[in-house]
Regions:
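Generic enzyme active-site microenvironment
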Residues: 61
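ATP-binding/phosphotransfer module of carbohydrate and carboxylate kinases, centering on a glycine-rich
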Residues: 1-17, 25-32, 48-58, 70-90, ...
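A charged helix-plus-loop insertion that forms the helical arch/lid used to bind
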Residues: 30-43
Length: 210
């Protein structure tokens, strides 16, 4: 919060603040925060805390949802008015947002879907085997990683039947290395807004709500 206030003070900002958070948010209350240890955040109204500290209205949104809101309003999905769209933010983890006819279905947390890791013969979080961090830690070639990632996309497709899957996050800038190996029965596109998507989406949602 102190870092946010420092930015606000630096720009002499008086408008609303948007903040992406890696967890489930309901009515601005944090419900989960697994990637941050959880206990110090769960049950906290982070919007109120930030607003009180910075002297501005604040709006909290799941970080993957923020990235998706940016891409559907200002990026590759802006001309898609109908159908189901999924936005993936693939980097240290996997963030997932979904829109039905441009309406956000919040807090999916589909990066934590359970998938079978054939190496250890156990079911683990998809992030553990399909994120870019997993590619690096297991020293996988792009083709090897794409094979894993494609299974994850097929799993998502079987659950949600999307018309379009947008791939963003850190891997998006390396799409020429893996996209040719991706075979899913829907449109696949690379995000336009790159790592700015979460920032843009959080700001957009804050402005929309205030």
């Amino acid at each position: 919060i102190s870092a946010i206030c420092e930015i606000v003070d630096g720009f002499k900002w008086k408008g609303p603040i948007g903040c992406g958070f890696p967890g489930v948010i309901r009515s601005q209350i944090i419900e989960t925060a697994a990637n941050l240890g959880g206990r110090n955040f769960v049950g906290v109204n982070l919007a109120e805390e930030i607003g009180r500290a910075c002297g501005c209205e604040a709006w909290i949104i799941n970080d993957a949802d923020a990235a998706g809101c940016a891409e559907i309003n200002f990026g590759i999905g802006k001309d898609r008015n109908e159908g189901v769209l999924i936005m993936l933010t693939v980097g240290t983890g996997i963030g997932v947002s979904m829109f039905s006819n441009r309406t956000l279905v919040p807090n999916l947390e589909f990066g934590h879907l359970r998938m079978r890791d054939k190496n250890i013969k156990k079911y683990v979080s998809a992030e553990k085997i399909c994120s870019d961090a997993a590619r690096k830690s297991h020293d996988l070639s792009w083709q090897q990683w794409a094979s894993r990632f494609n299974k994850y996309l097929e799993y998502l497709y079987s659950l949600c039947w999307p018309d379009l899957i947008i791939i963003g996050g850190g891997v998006a800038s390396k799409s020429e290395k893996f996209l040719k190996y991706i075979k899913v029965d829907c449109d696949i596109a690379i995000a336009k807004l790159e790592n700015r998507a979460g920032i843009i989406g959080a700001a957009y949602e804050a402005r929309k709500h205030f």
